[in-house]
Amino acid sequence: ERCQPFIDANVPIFIDKPLCDNLSDLEIFQKWIDEGKNFISSSAMRYCKEYEPYHQSTHELGDLRYVNVTMAKSWEKYGIHALETVYPIVGPGFESIQNIGDKDRNIVHLKHSKGIDINIANISDMLGGFGLISLMGTKGGIQIKSTDTYYAFKKQLQSYVNYLQTGQKPVPWNETYELMQLVSAGIESREKGGIKITLNKDK
C-alpha cells in the first residue's frame, strides 16, 4: 500500500528489506514487474566489503559443500539479511527450505542445486552472531564477519542512485523473486511444524 502511489505515478523507488514476506504480496510485485514498473529492493548485506571477494568466487575453497550464517532479531525482518549474505556467494538455484525453530529461534536448513547445504541460525537475542558466515569447501574453509556497515549502506545507496541514472537494476528481478520465496517459505515451514518446502521454479 505504501508503494502504490509511487508505482501509479511511475516514480522509481527503493523498497527497504524485505520486499515482502508472503506470496500474495510477491505476486503483486510480479504483476508490477510484468507491467514495467520501476522498483528495486535489497539488503545491505549484499554489499558488505568483507564478503565481496567471495561473490561467485570461492575457487580456493574448492566446491562449496556447507555454509553457515548467524543472524539476530526476527526471521520476518532479518532473515533476508542472512539470505542475501549467502545469495551472491552461491548464486541462484535454491531447491528447498526447512525451518525447525520457533518465532524467536529460527533454525533454517536450505538445499542448493550446486550440492551445498546451508544453515541459518536466526535467533532474536543473538546479537553477537550478526553478520557472521562460514564457508566450507572440498579444499578449504573460512569464517568471515562483516563489521563495516557504513561501507555496505553507502554502496547500497550508490546502487540505487545508479539505477535512477541508468535504469539498470543492480540485482536481477529473478534473484529478488527467489529470495522473497525463501523468506515466505521459511515462515510457512515454521508455522507448519518444520516441514520442508520445495521452491516453485516457475518464475
Segment roles from a protein language model:
Residues 10, 36, 193-194:
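Glycine-centered short loops/turns at secondary-structure junctions
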